[in-house]
Amino acid sequence: MRLQRERPQDAERLVTKIRGYEIALQDEAFAYVAHHYPDTFLISAKLLWKGISRTTPRFNAWSESWGGDDTLFNAAWVAENVQNKGPLGKVYPNADYLWEGDTPSFLYLVPNGLSDPNQPHWGSWGGRFTAEKVENILTGTGNDTVDPLLEQHRPYQMFSDAKDSWTHEEQEYNNEYATVFRWRRAFQNDFAARMNWSITEEFTKANHHPRVVFNGDASKSVVELKAKSGTSITLSAAGSSDPDGDSLAFRWWIYPEPTLANRSDDSLSQWTSWFSTLSGTETKLQLPKVATPTSYHVILEVEDSGSPSLFAYRRLIVQVMP
């Protein structure tokens, strides 16, 4: 507050650098900040954090948030892959409610090539959020302690939960929790691999992430390009490698929700037919015909054959021009 009074321009510049991600609106802190400093970049994982893992039998609530492969984060999985792995694993606690409820805030920042922390609506291991800030959000759980405190700070705005449509073993989901649990296999394998790293000094005794090259670019940055409506472009992962010499599986897909953002596009339901192949190191993408500039989010997902298998990604945003 002193900085704001004495050097308002510096205060404004500082605010633009702040990034915040909170879980479940457990207090009024973010509402206070958002009210007094409306330009602050704040994300509220209002409910989607529940998608990180299934609640324990002892608690057994929030069934609406269950989805994906729950065997990848239950007591048996934790015992085998975490608690049984060295001194760190020994101090890992059992869950009273659910495991890692706050971890989506960390997963949001993991630099795996999938996401950009400055673009909350693009989606990440830590969930996907709205493209625009939402006004005066409450806990969503009827918390009669926190909700009145939040209301004292109106008006305030934050990015908050968005929904993904995702299918797993013929079960269709369309909710905010799916923006997290759709990635469970990937982030749980990552967790298991890191525990393995903690118990060996030999590189060859643990698995490591693939290194993905996209159209000659070996960084983890999002690639953006423009292309003509109705034309075909070649997408290549040639040069991708694995530090352990594992074989690699390549998957090409379009992420519908960040592609659609605030528009509708019935043709997007046919996106699988736009690719010459959905696997392999190279594919051709037949671009749709558009009347106005339209962006499509293409994901290259690479999985190695190690144990546990590990994932890496690249994201291409193709702006299709009329």
Segments predicted by a language model, with ranges:
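N-terminal acidic, glycine/proline-rich low-complexity segments
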Residues: 1-234, 240-243, 247, 254-265
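Hydrophobic core residues within well-ordered beta-strands of beta-rich domains
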Residues: 233-234, 248, 296, 312
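Extracellular and select intracellular beta-sandwich modules with Ser/Thr-enriched
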Residues: 309-316
